[in-house]
Structures are given as C-alpha cells and as structure tokens.
C-alpha cells in the first residue's frame, strides 16, 4: 500500500520550568512567592515626617498588618506581564528544587507501572474493542478512533486556556523528570499541549498517518500502538536524565512520542510511501524520512541542543518499529497459511 502523506511532525518540548506545591500561577500570570502571611509594620518614634509616611502607607495598604506578597505583586506584576509570553514562567528557587530532588524519584516504580500498562494494553485491547462500548463502535469505524484521539488532545489544550485548571493539569498532564507528581502523568502528558503550534503540528501528523494506518491495522492494533508508543516515550524521557547525569531537567508534554511510534510503524510497513515535509517531498520515501528523524533525535540527545524531548521521540520510534516488525511477521505467517491451505485443493 502506497500513498502520499503530508507530515509536519510536532515535537515534545522539555520545558525548563518547575511547578511545585508551594508556588502557583495566578490568572494574570504574576509571581507569587512563599512568604509569611503577615508582618507588622515598624514605627520609629524619631522618624522624620512620620505622619506623612503613615498616611501614604495607609493609602497603599489600609491595614496595620500587611502581606509582603501583595507588595511583590504590585511591584513585579507589570514586569512579569511583559515578559511572560509562554503559558508559564520560571517559578521555583534552586533551594526548593534541591529539597524536592532529595525526596527521591520513584523511577523504578514508574518503570514497572509503564511496562505493566503496556502489557495490559497489548493483551487487553482485543477484548476491549470486541465487548466494551464505546470501543466496539471503533472496531467498525477505525478512522473515527483517530478523530477521537485528536479530540481528546484538543480538549486538554482547551483546559490549558483556563487558569482554574492549571493546578490539576500541572499535576496530571506534565511529566516531571526529577520529582514525579503523579504516576498518571506517564499517559496524561502524551495528551497535553499548551501552545497552538505544538498542537497543530502533532494533530496534523496524527491525521496524516493515523487514518491510513488505523484502517490497515484495525482499531485495536492502532490503539495499542498509539498508547504503548506514548508510554515508551515517557519511560525514555524519565530514564534519559538519569543516564546522561543531567543536573536540572524540566517537565515535558506532548503527543510526539506516540506520533513517532505511528511514523515508525507506518514507514516500516510502507517503506517506499511518499512523504511530504510541509509541501516538499522527502527523497527515498517514508523509511528514509524515518531514519533521518532517528538520527536527528539521537544527535539531539547527544549534543543536547534545543529544548525538545528527544529521548521521548526515540522511545516512541523504537516502539513503532517493533510493532511494524511484529505485524509484518504476523501478516507473512497468515499468507503462508493461506498458501498452504490453497495448495491442498490442487
């Protein structure tokens, strides 16, 4: 099966910010520091113009006991409003980071959880799509499964636009590398996008490759491929900082781990399919484009350029190739059985 697929494969950014329990982002994106709630004002008896100072102070802060947080917000709010072009800003201090880091990283338990989920998804998907609604609907409409995954990603992106949801999203939809806030983030981060360009590129890649691959593999196999590639990307993303001995790492998010898995499986099964990068055809077909992406991601891990999560890309790519190899072997065995069965009649 060959065809022309347009791809603008989005990347999974490894953000350089750390969200912690004792700091928060207000709806106006101002900085809130962890400072004592109140502090009494000190009055010097011999201070000049004491009455004027007290009067001016009361105009600004009408209470005797005032919060230093309110002063910080009033002074620094204009600066932070000008400089915060992203969804979040750098918040925590290095001391807080060290305290969180010293608390330990459940990397082993996350790995066991990830492998268990991958096994459960692989063996449970056939039953799920055979007997459990609404998954049974996707068995006969595999393309709609792709649209459903696309819709979930868009919905989570919409939640990122609501400041009231940030605390929930920071806990469950960001994959923290040094201090895991929730084990659900190993999957949740794969459905999370904070910027429109990131969402748009990933969803275009999902639509380009996913609709064709879901029709060929079936809903159950495609769902297993997508979810396990996402989990593999998260596991690689967690292990890479430890193996590379990186001192400071930020959280990551995005569906690119799963999408590189889809690309890997597609290119393995259809190596000569034509690929368009934006509007330009890639020479050599899908397999050449995939190998180029692997080389680029490997170089990114080694040279550590940019802020993308190259390890997650590699993890998803390896899972996609593994699925492609397994499916090709299964198809070949079925073909041999059919030939043997047909030979008995002649």
Swiss-Prot record:
GO cellular component terms, A-Z: mitochondrial inner membrane
Keyword flag Isomerase: no
Pfam family, one: Rhomboid
Disruption outcome: Impairs mitochondrial integrity.
Principal location: mitochondrion
MF-aspect GO terms: serine-type endopeptidase activity
Cystine pairs: none
Transit peptide interval: 1-73
This protein's record includes keyword Ribosomal protein: no
Swiss-Prot/TrEMBL GO biological process terms: regulation of mitochondrion organization; signal peptide processing
Active site: 256 (nucleophile), 313
EC number(s) from the headed UniProt entry: 3.4.21.105
Top EC group: hydrolase
Keywords, comma-separated and alphabetical: Hydrolase, Membrane, Mitochondrion, Mitochondrion inner membrane, Protease, Serine protease, Transit peptide, Transmembrane, Transmembrane helix
Record annotation: effect of changing residue 202 to A: Abolishes protease activity
Functional description taken from the UniProt entry: Mitochondrial rhomboid serine protease processing the mitochondrial membrane fusion regulator MGM1, and the cytochrome c peroxidase (CCP1). Required for TIM11 stability, ATP synthase complex assembly, mitochondrial morphology, cytochrome c (CYC1) storage and mitochondrial genome maintenance.
UniProt record similarity statement: Belongs to the peptidase S54 family.
Name of this protein: Rhomboid protein 1, mitochondrial
């Amino acid at each position: 099966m060959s065809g022309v697929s347009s791809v603008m494969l989005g990347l999974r950014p490894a953000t350089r910010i750390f969200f912690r329990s004792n700091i928060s982002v207000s709806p106006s994106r101002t900085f809130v520091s962890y400072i004592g709630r109140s502090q009494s004002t000190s009055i010097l008896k011999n201070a000049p113009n004491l009455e004027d100072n007290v009067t001016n102070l009361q105009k600004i802060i009408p209470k005797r006991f005032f919060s230093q947080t309110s002063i910080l917000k009033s002074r620094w709010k204009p600066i932070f409003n000008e400089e915060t072009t992203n969804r979040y800003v750098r918040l925590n201090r290095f001391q807080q980071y060290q305290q969180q880091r010293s608390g330990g990283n459940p990397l082993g338990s996350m790995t066991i959880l990830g492998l268990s989920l991958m096994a459960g998804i692989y063996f449970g998907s056939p039953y799920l799509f055979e007997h459990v609604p609404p998954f049974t609907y996707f068995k006969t409409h595999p393309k709609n499964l792709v649209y459903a995954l696309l819709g979930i990603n868009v919905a989570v992106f919409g939640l990122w636009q609501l400041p009231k949801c940030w605390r929930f999203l920071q806990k469950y939809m960001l994959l923290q590398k040094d201090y895991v806030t929730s084990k659900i983030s190993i999957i949740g981060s794969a459905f999370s996008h904070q910027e429109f360009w990131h969402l748009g590129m990933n969803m275009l890649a999902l639509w380009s490759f996913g609709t064709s691959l879901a029709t060929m593999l079936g809903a159950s196999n495609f769902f297993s491929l997508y979810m396990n590639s996402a989990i593999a990307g998260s596991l690689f993303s967690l292990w890479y900082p430890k193996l590379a001995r990186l001192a400071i790492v930020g959280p990551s998010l995005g569906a690119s781990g799963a999408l590189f898995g889809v690309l890997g499986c597609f290119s393995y099964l259809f190596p000569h399919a034509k690929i368009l990068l934006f509007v330009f055809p890639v020479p050599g077909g899908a397999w050449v484009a995939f190998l180029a992406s692997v080389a680029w991601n490997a170089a990114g891990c080694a040279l550590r350029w940019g802020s993308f999560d190259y390890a997650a890309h590699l993890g998803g790519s390896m899972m996609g190739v593994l699925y492609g190899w397994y499916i090709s072997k299964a198809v070949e065995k079925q073909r041999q059985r059919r030939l043997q069965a047909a030979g008995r009649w002649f």
